[in-house]
Structures are given as C-alpha cells and as structure tokens.
C-alpha cells in the first residue's frame, strides 16, 4: 500500500493490499478500501471503496478500473475485462445498485476477482462510493 504526503486515516479504517492513496486524501473512520484500488489526491473518502477501481472527485465517485495497477500485478486481460464489465454494470448501467449486484451474482463468471467484488459490496457498512 502506498500513501502519499498528507494522507490521513480515521480510526478503524481497513485497507486492502496494493492500495494507492493520493496526497491530501482524508479517509473517514470505519471506511474499507478494497485491494488494488486507487484514490485520487486531495479527495475525501466517506464511503467504502471496492477493489480494483479508481475513485476521485467531490463527492468521491467511480472513475474506472485500476487497469495499470492490475497489469503490473499480473492480472490477465480476461480478468481485467471481467472486472471492467462487472463495474460497468454496477456503476454505469441504469439499474439500481441492488439490481446490478444481482445481475453480477447471477450472470457473471464467478472468478476469484468477481467473488471479492461481490463479498466486498455485500459486507459494506458505510455504503459504496
């Protein structure tokens, strides 16, 4: 995990492996940050950030998957594409997030990455960005 200068964590924050937290980021207490995710500099994380994504903006929002980080860690192009499709369904489709999660659970190939995404979202207590 990489934390740039002035990044601040509240109490009981959970951070997955290979996370990149930009400079000046403030993470609220009890927030969970999923593995391989990246938070753009200068923003505030008040809700949980699922694995494998890039988030930025005020309020913090999904920007895309952490493609470069996943490539560097050796994820296959098939795994990256599946992650991208799952998050496109969850964040970008016109469905509400409950419906989108059900589609991911029922219609997507259940790889290790998809299972981590599903488990992370279902176990979120603070909501998802």
Label each PLM-derived region with a short phrase.
Residues 1-56, 60-61:
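Structural signal for interior beta-strand "rungs" in well-ordered beta-sheet cores
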Residues 58-129:
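Terminal amphipathic alpha-helical/low-complexity segments used for targeting or macromolecular assembly
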